[in-house]
Regions:
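Short, acidic, Ser/Thr-enriched surface-loop or helix-capping motifs
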Residues: 195-196
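Short, His- and charge-rich active-site/binding loops that engage polyanionic ligands
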Residues: 207-212
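Phosphate/diphosphate-binding loops
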Residues: 185-192
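Structured C-terminal cap/extension of enzyme domains
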Residues: 203-205
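N-terminal beta-alpha lobe that positions the nucleotide/phosphoryl donor
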Residues: 1-178, 187
């Protein structure tokens, strides 16, 4: 049986965070519970791992991270720029590109949201919410590019700082990508049951705005 590279929301649940990231697993859990969720699929983290291996980037990325001085903003920014360029400029393997494009066609929509979903996201000790990039109103023509940009956002300056702040710089962190049908929402928002900055467990934060 061939290894699955993508899974629909209907195939995922809260126990799948290690393959679909926190966001992907949560969307699957809500879909399974019958909550109205715009349909979509998750490009599993294994694809990112396979992508950087096939592009021969693993050692190069590790070497750059190992030599970062996280207390020097210039050092972090230079490292971030180098790693992101490596990921964005590498060629996506044909079989991976084909599966992602086929899944997109199955959604039957013109526009999708392409959203990063870290495998360490929404954990008890670390919340990666807001650390990685997402792209709205993405069309088929630039879908693969935006997927690679989501992968690259694992190494933005803020994400690198966050790694060191949480002591995760030596921990393997991967990233899945959510591809979800766009909707014309009137209001959208996010809620944190623990304050994401102060980590105060007695304070809940809800942020909302018009549109998406």
């Amino acid at each position: 049986m061939s290894l699955k590279l993508t899974l629909n929301f209907t195939e995922l649940g809260k126990g799948d965070a290690m393959i679909a990231g926190g966001k992907g697993a949560s969307l699957g859990e809500m879909t399974q519970a019958g909550i109205p969720v715009p349909p979509g699929f998750v490009v599993l983290f294994i694809i990112f791992d396979e992508f950087i291996k096939e592009a021969d980037l693993v050692q190069e990325i590790d070497n750059i991270i190992d030599n970062v001085n996280h207390k020097d903003i210039n050092s972090v920014e230079v490292a971030s720029e180098k790693i992101q360029a490596l990921i964005k400029n590498a060629k996506m393997p044909e079989r991976i590109a084909k599966e992602i494009n086929e899944k997109f066609k199955d959604l039957g929509t013109e526009f999708v949201a392409v959203r990063s979903s870290a495998t360490a996201e929404d954990g008890a000790d670390n919340a990666w919410a807001g650390q990685l990039d997402s792209f709205l109103n993405t069309k088929e023509a630039n879908l693969l590019e935006k997927v690679q940009h989501c992968w690259a956002s694992l190494f933005t300056p803020r994400a690198i700082f966050y790694r060191f702040e949480k002591g995760l710089h030596t921990t393997k962190i991967s990233v899945a990508v959510v591809v979800q049908k766009m909707v014309n929402s009137e209001i959208s928002g996010i809620a944190f049951s623990v304050h994401p900055v102060t980590e105060d467990r007695n304070q809940m934060i809800i942020e909302a705005g018009f549109g998406f």
